[in-house]
């Protein structure tokens, strides 16, 4: 039997409208790569990265979910078992910020009650095209008592910091049991098709 190379397994989700840059954020953290064109995620795909925090090796299983409204029924089952969720909006897209409230309601309905949440104000390198003031994001974060980060996958701003802070908060919040790998289904998110979309 192969020796397990990690102490804990955390399932994290990236949630938000299509085109806000979730895939770019994920690839910047997992592969330290940035591409202006990715295939828009129709179902769900995930990346694995192991980090060391508080003396423990933690395997992060990070799921990139479809943002389109019509695919919410597909992603609902993936909330189950998530220990941390990053909500992402695009500072150049006012609708993506308005929909954060809907995503928060989705989390309340489908995720574990004690799931750790974080709000990302993405594409902060495009501040000259900003339509969502920073203060609005800070306000909604305060109202829901969640962390708030300004991020940019393109400029590599706060990506690693956000992805390390979320599991740190999970570690502090609850005593975490070591996972049974047999209970973790990583096969159902492999089917990805789609079209090209811009993200930062």
Curated annotation (Swiss-Prot):
Keywords: Acetylation, Cell projection, Cytoplasm, Cytoplasmic vesicle, Endoplasmic reticulum, Endosome, Golgi apparatus, GTP-binding, Hydrolase, Isopeptide bond, Lipoprotein, Lysosome, Magnesium, Membrane, Metal-binding, Nucleotide-binding, Phosphoprotein, Prenylation, Protein transport, Transport, Ubl conjugation. There is a cross-link at residues 102, 136, 154 (Glycyl lysine isopeptide (Lys-Gly) (interchain with G-Cter in ubiquitin)). A motif (Switch 2) lies at residues 64-81. It is an enzyme of class 3 (hydrolase). Regulated by guanine nucleotide exchange factors (GEFs) DENND4C and RABIF which promote the exchange of bound GDP for free GTP. Regulated by GTPase activating proteins (GAPs) including TBC1D21 which increase the GTP hydrolysis activity. Inhibited by GDP dissociation inhibitors GDI1 and GDI2 which prevent Rab-GDP dissociation. A lipid is attached at residues 199-200 (S-geranylgeranyl cysteine). Highest levels in neural and muscle tissues. GO terms for cellular component: cilium; endoplasmic reticulum membrane; endoplasmic reticulum tubular network; endosome; endosome membrane; exocyst; exocytic vesicle; Golgi apparatus. It is found in: Cytoplasmic vesicle membrane; Golgi apparatus, trans-Golgi network membrane; Endosome membrane; Recycling endosome membrane. InterPro entries: P-loop_NTPase, Small_GTP-bd, Small_GTPase, Small_GTPase_Rab. The modification Phosphothreonine is found at residue 73. Interacts with MYO5A; mediates the transport to the plasma membrane of SLC2A4/GLUT4 storage vesicles. Interacts with GDI1 and with GDI2; negatively regulates RAB10 association with membranes and activation. Interacts (GDP-bound form) with LLGL1; the interaction is direct and promotes RAB10 association with membranes and activation through competition with the Rab inhibitor GDI1. Interacts with EXOC4; probably associates with the exocyst. This is Ras-related protein Rab-10. The lineage of its organism: Eukaryota, Metazoa, Chordata, Craniata, Vertebrata.
């Amino acid at each position: 039997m192969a020796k397990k190379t990690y102490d804990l397994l955390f399932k994290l989700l990236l949630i938000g409208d299509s085109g806000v840059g979730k895939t770019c954020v994920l690839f910047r953290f997992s592969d330290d790569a940035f591409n202006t064109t990715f295939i828009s995620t129709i179902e769900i795909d995930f990346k694995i990265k192991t980090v060391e925090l508080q003396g423990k090796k933690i395997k992060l299983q990070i799921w990139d979910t479809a943002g389109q409204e019509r695919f919410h029924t597909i992603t609902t089952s993936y909330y189950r078992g998530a220990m941390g969720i990053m909500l992402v909006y695009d500072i150049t897209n006012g609708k993506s910020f308005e929909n954060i409230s809907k995503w928060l309601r989705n989390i309340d309905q489908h995720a574990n009650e004690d799931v750790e949440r974080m709000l990302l104000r993405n594409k902060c390198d495009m501040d000259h095209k900003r339509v969502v003031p920073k203060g609005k994001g800070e306000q909604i974060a305060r109202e829901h008592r969640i962390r708030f980060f300004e991020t940019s996958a393109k400029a590599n701003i706060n990506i690693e910091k956000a992805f390390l802070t979320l599991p740190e908060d999970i570690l502090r919040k609850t005593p975490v049991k070591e996972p049974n790998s047999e209970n973790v289904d990583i096969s159902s998110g492999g089917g990805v098709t789609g079209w090209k979309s811009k993200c930062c």
